[in-house]
Amino acid sequence: MAGKKSSGKRSWPLLGLLVTVATIHLVICPYTKVEESFNLQATHDLLYHQLDIDKYDHHEFPGVVPRTFLGPLVIAAFSSPVVYVLSLLEVSKFYSQLIVRGVLGLGVISGLWTLQKEVRQQFGATVAVMFCWISATQFHLMFYCTRTLPNVLALAVVLPALTAWLQRRWALFVWLSAFVIIGFRAELAMLLGIALLLTLYQRRLTVARVLRHAIPAGLLCLGLTVAVDSYFWRYLVWPEGVVLWYNTVLNKSSNWGTSPLLWYFYSALPRGLGCSLLFIPLGAVDRRTYALALPSLGFVALYSLLPHKELRFIIYTFPVLNIMAARGCTYILNKKSWPYKVRAMLVTGHILVNVAYTATSLYVSHFNYPGGVAMQQLHELVPPQTDVLLHIDVAAAQTGVSRFLQVNDDWRYDKSEDVGAAAMLNYTHILMEAVPGHPALYRDTHRVLASIEGTTGISLNLMKLPPFDVNLQTKLVLLERLLRPA
């Protein structure tokens, strides 16, 4: 008993590592992209408008398909005490955005930590330690864990579901699986379904017992999402059912681009897992890892059949594959036939390579949110007592602008699209894309208050450290009206 307590105490710094790394990512890249918009705006509206649903953003900008409010409701509930205190202290709403994202990040890290505990039980302390170090040094897992993407909200539920599966707590596994599949991401039926089929094949669970939990879980979760989301959307809807029909049956997701069949395997997984990918085959020396590999790789293989692909779509597999990589690291560390320095150098070196890749990616990503930077500059450059009517164009709205950044209650912020040239002159300020020719249209009526740069990529430069340059160009311009329209 004393040994277990001592081991638990020694593991707490690893939790601190995960939280610290996630916080660094959050602070360096505090703004968001359009993919995160619905959940972020919905959480804002739940916090600040509460039952005044007419003021909610999704009524004006509903998006291509409806999304569920289940995730924003949970995030808002946990964020509300801190946000309330910040509002009493009259602190900028921008910091509420950080709190909201931080709460989501803690939810994901809590799932990682619970999974780590089970890894410690089944594979030993060394594998658990390596799992934490690998997870903390991978860019995409830490970068995305605070981002209000539907996939990340689902990840916060998938992690405890997978932990329950490893613990053979079948009832909890089925209930969590039903909740995340029906409420958040229907494609997770492939990942969690393969895990369930594997369990049935191994005769650890009977079909009758599965149905005894799956039927009430499915009905209850479906009823919950339909009831909650129909209230907020004001019509009868099962959001994830609509998304499933749109993306899978109609294959409309292809409108946002397509990738080759094996893209997840040769591009997404290497970028997501970093140098740790090389240790996964070594982890396969332990037959216990086969049960981890089959659902994860099977999910990626099946999901590859859909033409539209993004790395975040398979982020659920990263922690599971990290367990295999951690087992591979442990295999090397325990290989007595090799000199200890060689073993330690291989394992430590791959962690350092991950850190270098993460630091580079995070630095470049910092320049990817010109819309958020523009909103910050607007509030710094324009006195708060000024009468401001700001128009925000699509490019700005997609690269960092959110309701949390609308910090002046006396100003008016407008994201209306297809506004005519004459009507644009009614705005005191215009935040627009720096497309050649567009700012020139306002040369006689506006002045450039600020130009905001964004990244166009990186280029190799061996003459400096770090050996690359971030290529920047003006992405947005902030215009201020000179004269009032006649």
Curated annotation (Swiss-Prot):
Transmembrane segments: 12-32, 69-89, 94-114, 123-143, 146-166, 178-198, 213-233, 265-285, 291-311, 313-333, 344-364
Record localization: Endoplasmic reticulum membrane
GO biological process terms held by the UniProt record: dolichol-linked oligosaccharide biosynthetic process
Pathway: Protein modification; protein glycosylation
Keyword annotations: Endoplasmic reticulum, Glycosyltransferase, Membrane, Transferase, Transmembrane, Transmembrane helix
GO cellular component, as recorded: endoplasmic reticulum membrane
Keyword hit for Membrane: yes
Record EC number: 2.4.1.260
Topology relative to the membrane: Multi-pass membrane protein
Catalysed reaction, written as an equation: an alpha-D-Man-(1->2)-alpha-D-Man-(1->2)-alpha-D-Man-(1->3)-[alpha-D-Man-(1->2)-alpha-D-Man-(1->3)-alpha-D-Man-(1->6)]-beta-D-Man-(1->4)-beta-D-GlcNAc-(1->4)-alpha-D-GlcNAc-diphospho-di-trans,poly-cis-dolichol + a di-trans,poly-cis-dolichyl beta-D-mannosyl phosphate = an alpha-D-Man-(1->2)-alpha-D-Man-(1->2)-alpha-D-Man-(1->3)-[alpha-D-Man-(1->2)-alpha-D-Man-(1->3)-[alpha-D-Man-(1->6)]-alpha-D-Man-(1->6)]-beta-D-Man-(1->4)-beta-D-GlcNAc-(1->4)-alpha-D-GlcNAc-diphospho-di-trans,poly-cis-dolichol + a di-trans,poly-cis-dolichyl phosphate + H(+)
Enzyme class: transferase
InterPro entries: GPI_mannosylTrfase
Family to which the UniProt record says this protein belongs: Belongs to the glycosyltransferase 22 family.
Function: Mannosyltransferase that operates in the biosynthetic pathway of dolichol-linked oligosaccharides, the glycan precursors employed in protein asparagine (N)-glycosylation. The assembly of dolichol-linked oligosaccharides begins on the cytosolic side of the endoplasmic reticulum membrane and finishes in its lumen. The sequential addition of sugars to dolichol pyrophosphate produces dolichol-linked oligosaccharides containing fourteen sugars, including two GlcNAcs, nine mannoses and three glucoses.
Name under which the protein is recorded: Dol-P-Man:Man(7)GlcNAc(2)-PP-Dol alpha-1,6-mannosyltransferase
Organism encoding this protein: Mus musculus (Mouse)
Origin organism lineage: Eukaryota, Metazoa, Chordata, Craniata, Vertebrata
